[in-house]
């Protein structure tokens, strides 16, 4: 099965989970993320990147709220316009969002839309340099026991993750139903060191 076929099959399987099961599994995954967060030294200001769930993805919103309550700065991906992406060599950046400001962040409401730098209030939603992240929660479509990750095919995280500090905790999250025997990979595909599933 090639990547496109696997992607369709696993998304269909994920979509078939009923809403209550998805909510319960998302809550269990968020609880495990909070446990991990609590084990990290929070003496210094810390920053975690999460994502806004789309469709039937694991929803990390409860984890983001818990991180903010613990004093962590929370950042979300913002897709870049073609001009901005060409200028920086990346298709996305991370922008900090205050806990009470998530509903006003257009890149949270529209996570796949590309925004020009001038579209976003950078004083309200500042860009967080990749090397400033202490933890990042990565969405995925499918995964296997080796940590291989299948995303949506855009390569955004495969290009972004190498820019992180070696100390950054990288965690993929998924439902158990997204586990497969083997994820086909190419040279640019990165394995995730940690995947939490339920």
Q: Positions of the model-derived regions?
A:
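N-terminal active-site beta-alpha-beta segment that forms phosphate/nucleotide-binding
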Residues: 1-132
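Short glycine-rich anion-binding loops that position phosphate/pyrophosphate groups of nucleotides
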Residues: 54-56, 141-145
């Amino acid at each position: 099965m090639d990547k496109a076929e696997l992607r369709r099959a696993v998304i269909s399987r994920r979509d078939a989970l009923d809403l209550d099961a998805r909510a319960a599994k998302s809550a269990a995954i968020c609880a495990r993320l909070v446990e991990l967060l609590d084990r990290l030294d929070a003496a210094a200001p810390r920053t975690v990147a999460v994502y806004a769930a789309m469709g039937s993805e694991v929803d990390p919103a409860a984890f983001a709220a818990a991180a903010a309550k613990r004093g962590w700065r929370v950042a979300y991906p913002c897709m870049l316009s073609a001009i901005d992406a060409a200028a920086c060599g990346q298709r996305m950046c991370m922008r900090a969002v205050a806990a009470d400001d998530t509903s006003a962040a257009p890149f949270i409401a529209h996570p796949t839309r590309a925004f020009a730098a001038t579209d976003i209030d950078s004083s309200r939603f500042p860009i967080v340099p990749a090397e400033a992240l202490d933890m990042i929660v990565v969405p995925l479509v499918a995964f296997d026991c080796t940590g291989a990750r299948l995303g949506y095919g855009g390569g955004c995280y495969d290009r972004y993750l190498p820019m992180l500090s070696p100390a950054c905790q990288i965690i993929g999250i998924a439902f158990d139903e997204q586990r497969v025997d083997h994820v086909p990979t190419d040279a640019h595909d990165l394995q995730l060191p940690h995947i939490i599933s339920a």
